Amino acid sequence: MLTLARQQQRQNIRWLLCLSVLMLLALLLSLCAGEQWISPGDWFTPRGELFVWQIRLPRTLAVLLVGAALAISGAVMQALFENPLAEPGLLGVSNGAGVGLIAAVLLGQGQLPNWALGLCAIAGALIITLILLRFARRHLSTSRLLLAGVALGIICSALMTWAIYFSTSVDLRQLMYWMMGGFGGVDWRQSWLMLALIPVLLWICCQSRPMNMLALGEISARQLGLPLWFWRNVLVAATGWMVGVSVALAGAIGFIGLVIPHILRLCGLTDHRVLLPGCALAGASALLLADIVARLALAAAELPIGVVTATLGAPVFIWLLLKARR
């Protein structure tokens, strides 16, 4: 038994090391790749100062943090709701952030600065989160809380559709670009949003013990002494914050929160002591690679990153599911 535990521990360490190396390689490639390839030896030249440090580095850091946040949010929701299909958009938090951002674009007539749009997106996500916490205080079951989140998401989606229908051509272009996701407008002015993600990411990665209990189910978690009501509130609030900040940075991005945790579980990473940091590393790597494809796929334009993640991720996910069944 001890030998099996040690083998599993070594395997987990190997996985984390491999994911760390993959993330570092993706980070380096992201800094080098673009309309002009800039190798690491040229990073400190005047050309590298502009393209690498002023343009690519803030974008790369934003992609890395958003990918980690979305993947960890998916892992938290899948444990919290005991549903492998749970992901950040499921509770309506992503759509809530979208409603806040769309309201800011329409009411501000496209004149609001980026920091104001970011605050509105975060506010929209937190409002939906507060409504969910209100439901949670009524001690609803996990399944009913999940259904409440789905209903809120549908309402927010309807509001966004109405807003797009009545928007002007200029606003519509900005809204459609946001709905497909993208990091094209990210620079050092959004560094405060990046910093807002880091403490929550680190805190959740340290909460493996309650997460492992939650993954056992509500009844088992209560029997083990976990204050279920408290942890549900805290985790829903933390997820709402991460999703709101991510939407403020990059718009709506699918696939990462749904598929990354599921793929890692299929690979044998079920202990949240390994799964949570693994999700952060894998989510960051996947979104970095998708962002590189979005930048380089077309010569004259940039693809929406949400389209890239769905196109590349869905076939891989289906293949892994078929392989696991065999």
Curated annotation (Swiss-Prot):
It is a multi-pass membrane protein. It is found in: Cell inner membrane. Pfam families: FecCD. The keyword Cell membrane applies. GO terms for molecular function: vitamin transmembrane transporter activity. GO terms for cellular component: plasma membrane. The chain crosses the membrane at residues 15-35, 61-81, 88-108, 112-132, 146-166, 184-204, 240-260, 274-294, 302-322. GO terms for biological process: cobalamin transport. InterPro entries: ABC_BtuC-like, ABC_transptr_BtuC, ABC_transptr_permease_BtuC. SUPFAM superfamilies: ABC transporter involved in vitamin B12 uptake, BtuC. The keyword Nuclease does not apply. Keywords: Cell inner membrane, Cell membrane, Membrane, Transmembrane, Transmembrane helix, Transport. The complex is composed of two ATP-binding proteins (BtuD), two transmembrane proteins (BtuC) and a solute-binding protein (BtuF). Belongs to the binding-protein-dependent transport system permease family. FecCD subfamily. PANTHER family: FERRIC ENTEROBACTIN TRANSPORT SYSTEM PERMEASE PROTEIN, VITAMIN B12 IMPORT SYSTEM PERMEASE PROTEIN BTUC. Part of the ABC transporter complex BtuCDF involved in vitamin B12 import. Involved in the translocation of the substrate across the membrane. This is Vitamin B12 import system permease protein BtuC. It comes from Escherichia coli O9:H4 (strain HS). The gene is btuC.
